[in-house]
Design a protein with these regions (language model features):
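Extracytoplasmic gate region of multi-pass secondary transporters
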Residues: 45-46, 227-271, 278-279
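Helix-breaking motifs and short loop linkers at transmembrane-helix boundaries and internal kinks
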Residues: 57, 89, 110-112, 260, ...
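Conserved MFS/SLC helix-loop-helix module at the cytosolic interface between two early adjacent transmembrane helices
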Residues: 76-115
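Cytoplasmic helix-loop-helix junction between adjacent transmembrane helices
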Residues: 120-155
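Intracellular juxtamembrane helix-capping segments at the cytosolic ends
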Residues: 130-143, 330-344
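Helix-loop-helix hairpin linking two adjacent transmembrane segments in secondary transporters
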Residues: 151-203
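C-terminal transmembrane helical hairpin of 12-TM major facilitator-type secondary transporters
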Residues: 291-338
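A late C-terminal transmembrane helix in Major Facilitator Superfamily
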Residues: 345-379, 386
Length: 408
């Protein structure tokens, strides 16, 4: 039996000056671009990692301190996103997050010492975590069809595809990894302008929100943390995001350093991974309608296992990475889309804010663990380790389906 959620009146934040209805597509465009930026910021690191290793004389184990440094920012976002949004509003929270992320990426490029990059990782984690949680809550609160959340996460896939493609192309043109980060910072900075425009013009779809008062936001967060299905969803998505991040961070190193594939070919093969990912996100609405959400995740996990086995045992072929990207694409957004069916309505913002930010922990914890193991066992152990993660996701997903959905 699920515990009863806290009750209480909610308060709506509205502009004191009535304005004409604003086009909904503007807010959706901002949301989509926000996910492109976090996709680029996260995925570009994989191609730049060997250059960073060389610059600071690091090993696959010691470079993982960069991943670890992001954890504190992700944790802070996990426990504060719903409270910040209820106090400041969605748009101001996104502005803070965009400034934070831009600052972190630019500082990566400026860092003259390894400890500076490690320290700034906290800001990067905080910025990504707040953007992720805020945009997911905004979209899920307004959408009634799977296609919206699928399209949102497809744009993350576009960013994840662009990150390695941009980094590889700029490196081939003679830029160094620091200059690549300056380009990425410029791309992220455009989000600051978009969100600032929303605040200045008081764009209603993002300024008008029904959120629990600060007291009830805290109560709903506490309730979410006591709900088993929220905790299990967070753990499931943590492993899922960790798997995505491990592929993004380490696949290029496996392809180029371990398997001696030319740098340009290896870089674009990672872009192929994210092309498959993006196609999967774009097809999400159709797949959910035809298969149902639970069956879709089951099929995705099976396909993911097949792709990882082929990447491990058949290193010379080109189909495994796009297949892996396509397979993993539906898992995260489908799980988020199911959340309103699994928890009471009042708890949805806190639950989504918690699980998305906790999931972001996986982007630091799991690639870090894989790096330390690979430093001892060799880079070719990475495909096997990621396969074990896929098996773990299958076990967790079975636990989620046994929890069921709300019957009210």
């Amino acid at each position: 039996m699920k515990p009863n959620p806290p009750t209480g009146k909610t308060s709506s934040r509205r502009s004191p000056h009535p304005e004409a209805p604003a086009p909904a597509w503007i807010g959706i465009a901002i949301a989509f671009y926000a996910f492109i930026t976090i996709g680029i910021a996260e995925s570009g690191l994989g191609v730049l990692l060997p250059s960073i290793l060389e610059t600071f004389d690091l090993t696959p184990a010691t470079v993982t301190f960069l991943f670890i440094s992001q954890i504190s920012g992700y944790v802070l976002a996990a426990f504060s996103s719903s409270l910040i949004s209820s106090r400041l509003g969605l748009a101001p929270m996104l502005l803070v997050a965009a400034i934070t992320l831009t600052t972190a990426v630019a500082t990566y490029g400026l860092a003259t010492a390894w400890f500076i990059m490690v320290a700034v990782g906290t800001l990067l984690g905080l910025g990504i975590g707040l953007i992720d949680a805020g945009i997911n809550t905004y979209m899920v609160s307004d959408q009634q069809e799977a296609k919206w959340i699928g399209l949102l996460h497809a744009f993350y896939g576009i960013g994840a595809f662009l990150g390695p493609a941009i980094a590889t192309t700029l490196l081939m043109l003679g830029l160094n990894w620091r200059q690549v980060y300056f380009v990425i910072a410029t791309i992220v900075a455009l989000l600051i302008g978009g969100v600032a425009w929303i605040i200045i013009t008081r764009y209603q779809p993002m300024m008008v929100q029904t959120a629990a008062s600060n007291t009830h936001a805290l109560a709903n967060l506490r309730f979410a943390l006591k709900t088993p299905i929220v905790l299990l969803s967070g753990l499931f998505l943590l492993v899922n995001v960790g798997t995505e991040a491990s592929l993004g961070n380490w696949a290029y190193t496996v392809q180029h350093v371990s398997r001696n594939i030319p740098a340009s070919t290896a870089g674009y093969s990672i872009s192929a991974l994210w092309i498959g990912f993006t196609i999967g996100r774009l097809m999400l609405g159709v797949l959910v309608n035809r298969l149902g959400a639970i069956r879709l995740v089951n099929g995705s996990l099976a396909m993911l296992a097949v792709g990882l086995v082929s990447w491990w045992l058949l290193p010379g072929q080109w189909l495994s990475l796009p297949l892996i990207g396509f397979a993993i694409a539906a898992i995260f957004p489908t799980t988020i889309w199911l959340m309103p069916q699994r928890v009471p309505t009042a708890v949805v913002p806190a639950a989504i804010g918690f699980v998305t930010s906790v999931a972001s922990l996986g982007a630091a914890i799991i690639p870090t663990a894989i790096g330390w193991i690979a430093a001892r066992a060799g880079l070719e152990s990475i495909p096997v380790l990621i396969l074990l993660l896929a098996i773990g996701m299958a076990v967790l997903h079975r636990g989620l389906t046994q929890q069921g959905t709300l019957s009210n």
